[in-house]
A protein has these predicted regions:
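Transmembrane helical cores of multi-pass secondary ion antiporters/exchangers
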Residues: 1-400, 486-506, 510-521
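Cytosolic C-terminal regulatory domains/tails of membrane transporters and channels
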Residues: 391-521
Length: 521
């Protein structure tokens, strides 16, 4: 998908039609890239991150989300500056900063390939490292502007960015949670929720108690999203949740794809201006391509070294039983290294470099090349690395879902009769709902047995699941027949198009109930 999207941008930029001449200049002001794309993308990815798992592995996540980013940025910059001829330090540093963070959206593509605990760790790391990256980016731009990089200033920027961002995120999350509880219309609800990440982001960025020491919008968005996600079951009405999730999934998918398209659109211009950059700074094209490969390899090596050394230090200092349960093998570290994909965030940082920064086109070219290598080569190697590591199949989430459903059905079963009598429902309705609950409990119990034991599951359980599959097929084909009748009525002009849409929605909801939840990531 990454290659296809960048190729689409290239096609748009190269269309030789006079009416499309302005497409070559398609783009957004650099500072707008981060302000538009990051808040929404991070808000959605935070919603899909397990807070429980993140708390369990908080120490490693914080180290990877802060120290590893700083380490990677400066190692890449040092290698490019010292050995690869990128003799402008600020250019090497900006490239290092852009390539330092892993990407939460890219990590989401690994669902089903890695254990849920690993996915959660990678997602949480990616969310935190975005905040670290933007602070480093601000420092790198100061260096590009001729300022010296002072340790005290850098430390203050990190401290206040995370402190102010966390406080603003909590405040915005608390206020938004109170307000959304009173919004009943799904459209109004989703419009309101879409404003939350922007409010958190811009409010935090505007708070600057000391010069240069402002809050992190990224941290504010992540904290607000975590708070709202945790309080969601208490304040989100079911219809708002039902209609909202597909919208969020679609918008974030389009936004992430748009970053790749924007890079593709700007590549011809970047390559055109690269001639001047190459000549002015003595970069040869072969060297520019070599810089891409070396920067990618260094990003992988830096991640592996940091993870290896950090884990060994933690093991030496913490020998508690809890820590022993979280330990990973050497092969597991290799998998974590290759799973650190670069993606949309790196592109957003590169596109956000101000136009007056020397060698901006070179920076975009290098970062786009490394992201492509990461997405394509790393992405292709990762399944092989996972198989080599022999990571066992993780059924933890599936087991928890089945256990939770069984517990919910069991503990709520008696309430059917109580509530029915309380509201005066006829006995036959109470009995029908009770029978449905018993049937659902039986189905979940047998489904869990078949998924867990496979061919070794009890014969009765396998027989019931086979019958359930036939029932699902029957219901789906019956719905298909109903839709054909509905279309015939529309074609015969017996019903209006609006009537067709209304009945279609009823049939679609029924089919969604039969098929069950769909993975949106």
């Amino acid at each position: 998908p990454a290659i296809m999207l960048i190729f689409m941008g290239l096609v748009l930029a190269l269309i030789p039609v006079h009416a499309m001449h302005e497409v070559r200049e398609v783009g957004l002001p650099p500072h707008v890239i981060l302000e538009i794309f990051l808040p929404v993308m991070l808000f959605w990815e935070t919603r899909n991150t397990s807070w429980r798992e993140a708390r369990t592995r908080l120490r490693g996540i914080l180290l990877s989300g802060t120290v590893l980013v700083i380490f990677t940025a400066f190692v890449i910059a040092w290698v490019l500056h010292t050995f690869m001829g990128v003799y402008l330090w600020h250019v090497a540093l900006i490239i290092g900063v852009a390539l330092a963070p892993t990407d939460a959206v890219a990590v989401a593509t690994l669902n089903g390939k890695l254990p849920k605990s690993s996915i959660t760790t990678l997602k949480a790391e990616a969310l935190i490292n975005d905040g670290t990256t933007l602070v480093l980016f601000a420092l790198a731009l100061q260096v590009a502007g001729g300022h010296e990089l002072a340790l005290g200033t850098a430390s203050g920027m990190f401290f206040f960015s995370f402190l102010i961002g966390s406080l603003v995120g909590l405040a915005v999350g608390w206020g938004a949670n109170k307000l959304r509880a009173h919004i009943g219309n799904p459209m109004n609800f989703n419009v309101f929720v879409f404003t939350v990440p922007f409010i958190a982001f811009f409010l935090s960025e505007e708070i600057e108690p000391f010069e240069g020491m402002k809050g992190s919008g990224v941290v504010a968005v992540v904290v607000a999203a975590f708070y709202l996600t945790y309080r969601g079951p208490d304040t989100i009405k079911p219809q708002n949740r039902f209609y909202g999730l597909p919208i969020w999934s679609f918008v974030t998918y389009v936004m992430n794809g748009a970053l790749f398209v924007l890079v593709g659109v700007q590549l011809p211009s970047a390559v055109e201006h690269m001639d001047g950059v190459v000549h002015e700074y003595n970069y040869a094209w072969a060297l520019a391509l070599a810089v891409i490969v070396v920067a990618w390899l260094v990003s992988i090596a830096a991640r592996f070294i940091f993870l290896h050394v950090t884990i060994d230090i933690i093991r030496a200092l913490d020998r508690s039983e809890k820590q022993k349960q979280l330990r990973t093998t050497f092969r597991g570290r290799v998998v974590s290294t290759f799973a650190g994909l670069r993606g949309g965030v790196s592109l957003a940082v590169a596109l956000s470099v101000p136009t007056d920064v020397p060698a901006r086109d070179f920076i975009i070219f290098i970062v786009a090349g490394v992201v492509l290598l990461s997405m394509v080569v790393q992405g292709m190697l990762l399944p092989l690395v996972i198989r080599w590591a022999k990571i066992p199949v993780d059924t933890t989430e599936e087991d928890e879902i089945n256990e939770a459903v069984r517990t919910i059905i069991a503990e709520s079963f008696d309430s059917v009769a109580e509530i029915g009598q309380e509201i005066g429902a006829p006995q036959w309705i109470i009995d029908r709902i009770a029978d449905e609950q018993m049937y659902n409990a039986s189905m979940y119990r047998n489904l869990h047995a078949v998924r867990k034991h496979g061919a070794n599951a009890p014969e009765e359980a396998r027989r019931i699941i086979e019958a359930s599959d036939l029932e699902k097929e029957l219901r789906l084909r019956h719905l298909e027949k109903q839709r054909s009748v509905l279309k015939r009525l529309r074609n015969e002009r017996t019903i209006d198009t609006n009537v067709l849409h209304a009945i279609q929605e009823i049939l679609d909801i029924e089919e969604a109930r039969v098929l069950g939840p769909v993975e949106l990531e």
